[in-house]
Amino acid sequence: MTFQTNKYQVIKNAVSYDLANFILNYFLLKRDAVGFMYKHNIHSQSSILGTWTDQQIPNTYSCYGDFVMETLMVKMLPVMKQHTGLDLIPTYSYARAYKKGDELKRHKDRPSCEISTTLNLGGDPWPIFIDGTGSNNVIDEYKNIHKPNAPAGTKVLLE
């Protein structure tokens, strides 16, 4: 299975367990700290700190452009280039800390997601759906993938 023929690819062990666990714990700690600061008026709401108001999954913490996630995106760039054969330019990162009962509904990503990466850093397994042909294809239910998504573009899935 190659990216060039299937328009998606699952890449096993793209991120080490230790790195994934470190980033997961960082993001969960950030979520809790930001929640505390907002609740106790220690810091005003700021997109750089994250939000619970994303319309795709309200009341679930997410952050656009988190510095650690941006760093991970740059670190994964050589892997993405190697597997796609494309000269890619990183555009943005977006992270979400799913909680029990959350479901990311079928949606279309913005044009800058033409080539994108879906990565689960920990938690329960969820299937990922990719609709590059007009049908629902369950790609993998491996323990390190959990973001169900059906974007308009193509994906490389890092595990």
Task: Give a label for each model feature.
Residues M1-T84:
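Non-heme Fe(II)/2-oxoglutarate
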Residues Q4-T5, I89, K155:
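A short, polar/charged loop/turn motif at coil->beta-strand junctions and beta-hairpin connectors
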Residues K7-Y8, Y92, P127:
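A residue-level signal for beta-strand positions that form part of recognition/binding surfaces
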Residues G85-Y94:
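A short coil-to-beta-strand element that immediately follows conserved catalytic motifs
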Residues A97:
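Conserved active-site beta-strand element of glycosyltransferases/polysaccharide synthases
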Residues K100-E159:
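Catalytic core of non-heme Fe(II) oxygenases with the double-stranded beta-helix
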